[in-house]
């Protein structure tokens, strides 16, 4: 049944986006303030078609940026409470050069200072993990983070939706075509159906579609949220059971891999970044042979054992996905109130790693509770004000290749 723009809904909070960020925010808001009238809108409720639906689900907590470390730690604490969708299998960073090994030692020291357990593994300890890596990699250096793990983003998202619904949050499948303003204040949203829904607070948890939505609202400043395409491949299903293994990252090669249960997955950032200027209805793009095939070939060559299920030619296993996610000029989320626009809030460019932590922080900001002001300042959506859109886009795209170098 359509929701009309009547008096009953003028004081409600609308969240656009029902991925893990929007759904977890709806839960935390409804838990902290049961009287809050919350509506979550998404063009697809039954299917999760945003980045949440395609994210590999790596959850590494240590980051060279303290704010992201804290948000990741907070997120893991929340995910473990759900008893579903998160497995603490640990995370490995592997290096094969002296420089890479030195970097691992540096990250070990820094992670310990941050209060996160980590240790370097010797060759014998690596072998005991029974990783699906080629023999030539058996002697590589490895840094192990035992408290890291892997998430099933869609499972986590569904759990938060369910808990939010139990708290009275409403989820409606609808496509938002614009933001309605009165002066410098948000008063509602306009749907593609022509309806207008009133609200006093509006949260954009719109991920890769943020820029395109803001382009339709000339009264709202643009933000440097740049959608990019990313290759991820799945191996053939295994014909035998194996013990769960830690997720693996090779920072020197910009490659990562994880065990998905019946098969392995591999992704790589070792290619020129590709801006997706007009995202479609899902967070995917057609696979680009000329760009992705060479990168994936480099990623799997001499890296995995034969029983990992990969092949050295397309489709490299069983399935290839051209995923889409957002980058920003400093590889940090945009979270908080939008300056100069009363009632508008933003929660975008957020990975599963930090989603619950970001949602809890925004809930505190919106309800005027005590919150970490230093982290909020780091994530302020207006922190790039004064710089040109062209410069910010170029800077954001440059961040793509550094995602799994040292800032993991």
List each model region and its residues.
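Central helical "cap/lid" subdomain
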Residues: 194-246
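Beta1/beta-strand and adjacent pyrophosphate-binding region of the FAD-binding site
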Residues: 6-21, 39
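Dinucleotide-binding Rossmann-like beta1-alpha1 core, especially the glycine-rich loop
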Residues: 56-129, 254-257, 295
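Flavin (FAD/FMN) cofactor-binding and adjacent substrate-gating region
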Residues: 81-83, 97-168, 172-173, 178-185
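Conserved beta-strand-loop-beta-strand element in the redox core of flavoprotein oxidoreductases
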Residues: 178-197, 202
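Glycine-rich FAD pyrophosphate-binding loop
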Residues: 30-52
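C-terminal catalytic lobe of FAD-dependent flavoproteins
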Residues: 298-408
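Active-site lid/adjacent beta-loop-alpha segment flanking the redox-cofactor pocket in flavoenzymes
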Residues: 221-223, 237-343
